[in-house]
């Protein structure tokens, strides 16, 4: 059976920077309050860029980085909870924009774990078919589902997109996954969709649930446990000691979650790459944005051992062990 490796990365974030100080002018908060509780200093917010645009720009970068053509792609998966349309899918729209005429395309919704889920689905599809190359994108326009009057949530989120290209290779690359879901606790992180109204049914149930709602304490507890479980499982499957792992690239939600997880794992927090201070929580986009940033900075070398780990609404969580191949 063929191995699967990451051969290219890309990302896009809006130019519009929203600082903590600016947010303190629209809600009752402060830079000190946000910074000490989350580690976030600023975030990028769309001024017209939609999910399709951001996903497309990240895809173009990844294609260029992988030194391939768009028509080499056999599969496009977009992980998003903020699509522009119910149909066509974001993936089909990206296909149109980049000219990937040979690709099978679809979206998945797994919130902040979406990129990890997308990688696992893509690996399975590549290994068990004629397909050779896949484009996985995490893209979010979270600013449109944030309640800008809720100081507990509006300070957390940002917009952006990140992408990775996978390919069948001779050398080892993507090694092991650990992915789980816990719908029993889904009520702790929610966002409503359409009101359940038609001419036969008038229902006000969803009218007050069109924005992100979060039980911060429960999500914090869940996140630390989920990240720890995932990393322990990946260690067991790969037989890696954490001292061998160059970086852990986690979902960029909150610096305190990462710090508590590092303590639980008895490892230095510096092993966890963090860029949430600049971008905030970009949900499914956070891991691929971080991965692309590291790739561009030259922080990763061939055969480096890295672990990606995500957690989010659903509740969902998962991770993957990778031998870096670029």
From Swiss-Prot:
Pathway: Lipid metabolism; fatty acid biosynthesis. The gene is fabH. CDD domains: KAS_III. Belongs to the thiolase-like superfamily. FabH family. The active site is at 112, 251, 281. It comes from the Bacteria. Residues 252-256 are annotated as: ACP-binding. SUPFAM superfamilies: Thiolase-like. This is Beta-ketoacyl-[acyl-carrier-protein] synthase III.
């Amino acid at each position: 059976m063929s191995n699967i490796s990451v051969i290219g990365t890309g990302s896009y974030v809006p130019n519009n920077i929203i600082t903590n100080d600016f947010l303190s002018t629209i809600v009752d908060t402060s830079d000190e309050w946000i910074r000490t509780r989350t580690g976030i200093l600023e975030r990028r917010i769309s001024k017209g860029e939609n999910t399709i645009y951001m996903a497309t720009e990240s895809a173009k970068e990844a294609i260029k980085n992988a030194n391939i053509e768009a028509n080499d792609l056999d599969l496009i998966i977009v992980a998003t909870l903020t699509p522009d349309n119910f149909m066509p899918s974001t993936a089909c729209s990206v296909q149109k924009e980049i000219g990937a005429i040979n690709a099978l395309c679809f979206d998945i919704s797994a919130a902040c774990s979406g990129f990890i889920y997308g990688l696992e689905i893509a690996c399975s599809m590549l290994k068990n078919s004629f397909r050779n190359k896949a484009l996985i994108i995490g893209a979010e326009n979270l600013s449109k589902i944030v309640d800008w009057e809720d100081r507990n949530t509006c300070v957390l989120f940002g917009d952006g997109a990140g992408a990775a290209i996978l390919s069948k290779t001779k050398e080892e690359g993507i090694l092991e996954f650990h992915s789980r879901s816990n719908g029993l606790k889904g009520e702790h992180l929610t966002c409503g969709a359409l009101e359940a109204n038609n001419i036969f049914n008038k229902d006000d149930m969803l009218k007050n649930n069109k924005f992100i709602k979060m039980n911060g304490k429960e999500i914090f507890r869940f996140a630390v446990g989920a990240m720890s479980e995932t990393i322990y499982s990946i260690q067991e499957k790969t037989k890696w000691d954490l001292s061998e792992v160059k970086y852990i690239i986690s979902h960029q939600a909150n610096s305190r979650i990462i710090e508590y997880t590092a303590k639980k794992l008895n490892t230095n927090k510096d092993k966890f790459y963090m860029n949430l201070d600049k971008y905030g929580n970009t949900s499914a986009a956070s891991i691929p944005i971080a991965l692309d940033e590291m790739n561009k900075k030259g922080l990763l070398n061939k055969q480096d051992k890295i672990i990606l780990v995500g957690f989010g609404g659903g509740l969902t969580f998962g991770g993957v062990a990778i031998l870096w191949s670029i």
